[in-house]
Amino acid sequence: MANVVVIGAQWGDEGKGKITDLLSKSADVVVRYQGGVNAGHTVVVNGQTLKLHLIPSGILYPDTECIIGSGTVIDPEVLIQELDQLKLLGVSTANLLISETAHVTMPYHRLIDRAAEELRGSHRIGTTGRGIGPTYADKSERTGIRILDLMDATTLQEQLRWAVNHKNVLLEKMYGLPPYDPAEIIAEYLTYAERLRPHVVDCSLKISDAVRRRRNILFEGAQGTLLDLDHGTYPYVTSSNPVAGGACVGAGVGPTMIDRVIGVAKAYTTRVGEGPFPTELTDQLGELLCDRGAEFGTTTGRKRRCGWFDAVIGRYAVRINGLDCLAITKLDVLDQLDEIKVCVAYEIDGERCEDFPNARRFARCQPIYETLPGWKQPTDHCRSLEDLPPQALNYLKFLAEIMEVPIAIVSLGAERHQTIIVEDPIHGPKRALLPASPVPVPKIA
């Protein structure tokens, strides 16, 4: 038995969907523990591309129980669209469960999200505009509407009338926008309630029962460590806790129930939206990474900013999450490069900094690089470490050494089979993967 958390070790978009999909084969239960439709993961199976925002990747395995936990915020309209999309592809959703205590995103949340971002002007934070922040704000203010409220028509009507009237004041007075008609929203969401009702349960009991029965549980995080509300690059963060500790709160399990934490990181770095990005490449090389990596957001379609691998934020993710191992994705994107740089430290006001700094200092960081040779040949066909070009293997060893954590999985493309499993990241021995000892890495002057 193993209870495993999968988290993003960068700014999100690391390829967690594919890794979770691979690991779901060994899982009895997959739990999404935070975030909402601001996250998106793409899974490719037999040439079919699935873009999901709320439903866990494990839905592709009919014997795997998939849970949307209480720490998430759910947009019912989007969730139903995903259910319909899966049905068209012949994927059963009978194994999907929705926590009755998860909060619900309303139309006014989306409108307020976009209006507030517009009002920030030059201080905008790069929100997706999907209403996530305002939904979590209502949760914190204890005025939010939960799934269990959605399931009771009388309660929903009472709460929505009050909520809509309250939000209309904000929309009209602060943002100069027209008010909502409570009756229209009530009618719309009562329809959603009937569609989702068969999936709604007390998920904390389901998860507790799975733990008691020693079933394999996979906790799936959205976004990434550097977008964490408390530990990320504030204020350019999300409104929840994607870090491993968030799994306990968002799923309703004790910390002693977690056996292993797996971090997912690209072989380079990307970021969407605003905020400092020390290793960002704004030249043709950045465009090359964007084109080869198809770096456009699953949720917003926005172009991602691209840069070299940043081991400083990587080590920070290892520390904050207690990572046991790493999955490195999109190694194949680097196949055409003559040389590859890795940020090993920062220079801040003339001083070397090897630890992740506070937000004010982070905005002044200049990267300090180590340069490694590229391999200039395709890797997407490789299925073992022995198949990799020596320079590619050296690059992975260097990342593992500088991050001080072993690499368990290497992804070389979007398809399931384009993967090297170094060792079973769920059942394999902890910290016994690549590399076992420091590895000398040739460098280009």
Curated annotation (Swiss-Prot):
Catalytic activity: IMP + L-aspartate + GTP = N(6)-(1,2-dicarboxyethyl)-AMP + GDP + phosphate + 2 H(+)
Keywords, alphabetical: Cytoplasm, GTP-binding, Ligase, Magnesium, Metal-binding, Nucleotide-binding, Purine biosynthesis
Keyword tRNA processing annotated: no
Gene Ontology BP annotations: 'de novo' AMP biosynthetic process; IMP metabolic process
Protein residues bound to substrate: T298, T299, T300, G301, R302, K303, R304
GO molecular function: adenylosuccinate synthase activity; GTP binding; magnesium ion binding
Binding site for Mg(2+): D13, G40
Enzyme class, UniProt record, top EC level: ligase
Compartments (UniProt record): Cytoplasm
Stored Pfam families: Adenylsucc_synt
Cofactor binding comment, as recorded: Binds 1 Mg(2+) ion per subunit.
The organism's place on the tree of life at top rank: Bacteria
InterPro entries associated with the record: Adenylosuccin_syn_GTP-bd, Adenylosuccin_syn_Lys_AS, Adenylosuccinate_synth_dom1, Adenylosuccinate_synth_dom2, Adenylosuccinate_synth_dom3, Adenylosuccinate_synthetase, P-loop_NTPase
Keyword Lyase included in the entry's annotation: no
Pathway in which the depicted protein is active: Purine metabolism; AMP biosynthesis via de novo pathway; AMP from IMP: step 1/2
Record: active site: D13 (proton acceptor), H41 (proton donor)
Entry EC number(s): 6.3.4.4
SMART domains: Adenylsucc_synt
First-listed, main subcellular location of the protein, grouped into a coarse class: cytoplasm
Subunit structure: Homodimer.
PANTHER family, alphabetized: ADENYLOSUCCINATE SYNTHETASE (PTHR11846:SF0)
Family, per entry: Belongs to the adenylosuccinate synthetase family.
Protein name: Adenylosuccinate synthetase
Species of the source: Cyanothece sp. (strain PCC 7425 / ATCC 29141)
Encoding gene, per UniProt annotation: purA
